[in-house]
């Protein structure tokens, strides 16, 4: 996981930033390189999730399950010319890659994700649940367990929007696309 982080310099600034986070005042945008393309080029995923602190995992569950919290994200497919990630082969376009001993072919697709909620491992769990696990995610993609082909998970917090905690000026930070 890579990307942009925000740190507060003072306790008052931290309090304001936390308040913005809780009231959905933060625009949190991620890029993920996933195996397989979602059935729709853009969409909203809304599920209930529960965290298992013992195993440091989360899973989708029913709304009635003890500890269940709503999890909502929006995704959009990124065109090849706007990619942040290079594909596994180093190409800037989608490629087919073999992920398992059965040589199951998967198609890499880059998604832009906007979080409405920020649950533990939310993006990883929800994308895996629709058959689009993140490249390099050995926790939620059993096809990759023990596979060392990718060194890191291809998930990046690439854009943040929020109001400055003192001046209330709109702040916008964004990583540039991979020039390769």
Task: Please tell me what each predicted stretch does.
Residues 1-180:
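RNA pseudouridine synthases
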């Amino acid at each position: 996981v890579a990307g942009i982080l925000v740190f507060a310099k003072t306790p008052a600034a931290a309090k304001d930033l936390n308040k913005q986070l809780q009231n959905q005042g933060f625009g949190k945008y991620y890029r993920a390189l996933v195996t397989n393309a979602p059935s729709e080029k853009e969409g909203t995923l809304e599920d209930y999730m529960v965290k298992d602190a013992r195993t440091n995992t989360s899973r989708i569950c029913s709304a009635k399950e003890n500890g269940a919290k709503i999890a909502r994200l929006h995704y959009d497919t990124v065109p090849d010319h706007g990619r942040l990630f290079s594909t596994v082969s180093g190409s800037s376009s989608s490629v087919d890659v073999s992920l398992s001993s059965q040589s199951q072919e998967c198609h890499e697709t880059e998604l832009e994700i906007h979080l409405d909620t920020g649950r533990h491992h939310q993006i990883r769990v929800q994308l895996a649940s629709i058959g689009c696990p993140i490249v390099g995610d050995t926790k939620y993609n059993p096809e990759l367990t023990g596979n060392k082909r990718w060194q890191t998970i291809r998930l990046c917090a690439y854009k943040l929007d929020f109001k400055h905690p003192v001046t209330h000026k709109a702040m916008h930070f964004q990583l540039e696309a991979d020039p390769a």
